[in-house]
């Protein structure tokens, strides 16, 4: 059950997710290695961790055709590998009534699909996302924008016949047939950042304290509606 509706004073219930008798538990294997260091009687600390995690029978909310009466079905769609590095540097400093605790952390996390259901090459999951072996989950799969047509003379004849004019967007014609359609979609980046981190500081003086926390991430793609 996934949705409800009131009609003529009566409560209704609608099914949005189809059942799956073949559904299996995910299976995961993970390896970790790390190091913890402390200097100057604990005033400075450093932690480093690395991990690799392989997941099989990956669970995913797979879209289903609207003609089925459902919007999605939970399926085992393939296998995935996650790997990453995490570093934390900490400081505990103080003198008299004053103390300062600081932590800086940064993480580099990657994932990629290593196998797909029924050996499919690609599985489209929405109008702008798809799953493909070797690509990260969370990748954008869409037609690539290249700029703006400055004049009608630039426009290929077939595209001009479709009503495209100067001032309209230029999209990359992947298959080279002068027709922009679903076959021209490609992977254009990932919503997953290359690295994330945070910087935390707590200052204390007698009965007063001040805390500040900053977070950051870099090089992830965003889609604007």
Can you describe what each PLM-predicted range is?
Residues 1-26, 45, 49-80:
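Solvent-exposed loop/turn elements at secondary-structure boundaries
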Residues 75, 94-190, 222:
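Conserved small-residue
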Residues 33-37, 48, 87-91, 199-205, ...:
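Residues on the lipid-exposed face of transmembrane beta-strands in outer-membrane beta-barrel proteins
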Residues 27-31, 81-85, 98, 193-197:
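Residues that define the transmembrane beta-barrel architecture of outer-membrane proteins
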Residues 50-56, 91-93, 106-112, 205-207, ...:
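Transmembrane beta-strands of outer-membrane beta-barrel pores
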Residues 190-224:
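Glycine-rich, aromatic-lined ligand/substrate-binding cores of catalytic
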Residues 42-46, 85, 96-97, 207-212:
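Repeated loop/turn-to-beta-strand initiation elements of outer-membrane beta-barrel proteins
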Residues 13-19, 68-73, 88, 179-187, ...:
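Extracytoplasmic loops and strand-loop junctions of Gram-negative outer membrane beta-barrel proteins
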């Amino acid at each position: 059950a996934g949705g409800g509706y009131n009609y003529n004073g009566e409560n209704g219930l609608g099914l949005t997710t189809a059942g799956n008798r073949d559904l299996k538990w995910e299976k995961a294997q993970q390896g970790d290695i790390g190091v913890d260091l402390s200097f100057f009687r604990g005033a400075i600390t450093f932690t480093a961790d690395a991990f690799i995690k392989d997941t099989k029978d990956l669970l995913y909310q797979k879209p289903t055709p609207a003609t089925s009466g459902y919007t999605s079905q939970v399926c085992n769609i393939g296998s995935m590998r996650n790997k990453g590095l995490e570093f934390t540097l900490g400081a505990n400093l103080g003198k008299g009534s004053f103390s300062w605790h600081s932590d800086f952390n940064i993480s580099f996390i990657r994932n990629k699909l290593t196998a797909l259901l029924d050996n499919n090459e690609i599985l489209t999951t929405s109008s702008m996302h798809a799953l493909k072996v070797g690509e990260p989950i969370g990748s954008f799969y869409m037609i690539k924008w290249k700029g703006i047509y400055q004049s009608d003379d630039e426009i290929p004849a077939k595209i001009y016949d479709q009503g495209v004019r100067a001032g309209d967007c230029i999209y990359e014609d992947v298959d080279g047939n002068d027709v922009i359609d679903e076959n021209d979609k490609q992977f254009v980046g990932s919503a997953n950042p290359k690295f994330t981190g945070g910087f935390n500081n707590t200052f204390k003086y007698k009965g007063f304290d001040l805390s500040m926390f900053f977070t950051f991430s870099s090089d992830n793609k965003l889609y604007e509606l």
